[in-house]
Amino acid sequence: MEVKDILKTVDHTLLATTATWPEIQTILDDAMAYETASACIPASYVKKAAEYVSGKLAICTVIGFPNGYSTTAAKVFECEDAIQNGADEIDMVINLTDVKNGDFDTVEEEIRQIKAKCQDHILKVIVETCQLTKEELIELCGVVTRSGADFIKTSTGFSTAGATFEDVEVMAKYVGEGVKIKAAGGISSLEDAETFIALGASRLGTSRIIKIVKNEAIKTDSY
């Protein structure tokens, strides 16, 4: 697989709590230069970033991030605000307390409400696979499919682990037609990126692939 084809799947990501505007600018510049799928950045930078790229790059942001246990009303507001500010794509975190209580109907209803606000904007649903049993992940594949979301996403990158090959294999087997897969967190090599794509992921959330391409790969515990 050619590097340019891998880059087309990448949501070039910077979600560090201390991210500065010059750092965000670098993410945006690199994403445009290497023609990634989007740049994924904190919501507080969306308006400025959208103005900066002026339609040359899709802007992705996160809501309910990273813990997911804010109320549905709060997430709906975050979604509306992000889109109003110029976000093209929304990555939302589900409420894992609902999952652990077995209340999958509430999870599905929340996703439906947010998808309704997204309208034609892309919605990706972060399920935080490292916190799930295999049975819970399988159930959530059905929930995300029924909710009308565009993607199911493995991880925030802020929990105990990121994407694994095994989890993406499960998603590819159980998610419904029309729902795509985003692998995120800990993707640190072109080889891993290519494997995730081969297993069924059509998006990759990472900050490292461009660094590798630029021969600037560094070892880090961040997203």
From Swiss-Prot:
Catalytic activity: 2-deoxy-D-ribose 5-phosphate = D-glyceraldehyde 3-phosphate + acetaldehyde
SMART domains in alphabetical order: DeoC
EC number per UniProt: 4.1.2.4
UniProt key word Cytoplasm: yes
Chain's role: Catalyzes a reversible aldol reaction between acetaldehyde and D-glyceraldehyde 3-phosphate to generate 2-deoxy-D-ribose 5-phosphate.
Database matches in NCBIfam families: deoC
Protein name: Deoxyribose-phosphate aldolase
Organism the protein comes from: Streptococcus pyogenes serotype M12 (strain MGAS2096)
